[in-house]
Amino acid sequence: MVGFILTGHGQFAPGLASAIAMVAGDQPAFTVVPFEGDQAASYGEDLRAAITAMREECDGVLVFTDLLGGTPFNQAMMIAQ
């Protein structure tokens, strides 16, 4: 199974996850890591921890972000390398 991590600025990720749950129900191997201003200092560590945990239980991990070139995208790319 492939794991999915949804991340983005502000309430983008939790809001989209809520819509997905309403339409498709709870999904296995799916987690949300929001990037909010008051948690900016720990965001990279939080995302890395989520990816590491997902790798332990899944065959692969896809990280979905809101903006190409934004902090969530850039952090995910740095972790992937």
List each model region and its residues.
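N-terminal loops that bind phosphate or other acidic moieties
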Residues: 1-81
